[in-house]
């Protein structure tokens, strides 16, 4: 039996967008549309779609490599019961996803974006990213805030509480500037933020002196 492009597209949508397992998808298509499609055929539909979109995915990778700013992350999940990692590299307009059994450099090298990326990469301080020397690094402030709050709650570090307020205040200033149609903060505000930030870092070092 032959199936048309609409059936195949709907099947791929159910699997990739709604995350419906093959057996449930098979049952859904049979119950709603009286289509007796095997799970093997459903997998074939997906593999064909993956092959068809390769030119588009390669174009996305190439565009991200040339971007001035990129974002990278890795999220653990399971493939057929085995631990794997979903790697993402994105810009404000494009996102590339690829699963890999490794979380580290073996995966990011195989994916091929970061070895050629020369812009600024925003990430979560995962050690793998620092192994790439052609790019600039920017660390995620959400992760900074989590670590700072942990220092406040677990170790009663006063400097960490001040840094939380500093980062959140800077974020609020950026949001207000954005709402006002500005693309950057005034130089005076930036200078003040830097001064407060540096003072808090100095306070933190005073609270936690380096060993002799």
Give residue ranges: language-model regions.
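Catalytic center-proximal scaffold of phosphoryl-transfer enzymes
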Residues: 1-212
């Amino acid at each position: 039996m032959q199936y048309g492009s609409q059936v195949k597209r709907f099947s791929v949508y159910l699997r990739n967008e709604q995350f419906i397992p093959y057996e449930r998808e098979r049952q859904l298509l049979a119950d709603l549309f009286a289509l007796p499609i095997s799970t093997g055929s459903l997998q074939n539909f997906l593999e064909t779609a993956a092959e068809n979109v390769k030119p588009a995915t390669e174009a996305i990778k190439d565009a991200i490599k040339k971007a001035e700013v990129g974002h990278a992350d890795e999220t653990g999940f399971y493939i057929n019961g085995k631990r794997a990692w979903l790697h993402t590299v994105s810009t404000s307009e494009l996102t590339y996803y690829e699963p890999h059994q490794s979380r580290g450099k073996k995966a990011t090298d195989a994916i091929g974006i970061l070895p050629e990326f020369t812009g600024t990469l925003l990430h979560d301080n995962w050690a793998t990213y620092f192994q790439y020397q052609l790019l600039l690094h920017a660390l995620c402030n959400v992760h900074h805030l989590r670590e700072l709050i942990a220092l406040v709650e677990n170790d009663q570090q006063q400097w960490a509480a001040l840094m939380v307020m500093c980062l959140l205040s800077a974020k609020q200033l950026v949001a207000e500037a954005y709402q006002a149609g500005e693309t950057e903060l005034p130089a005076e505000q930036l200078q003040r933020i830097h001064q407060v930030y540096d003072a808090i870092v100095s306070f933190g070092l005073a609270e936690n002196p380096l060993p002799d």
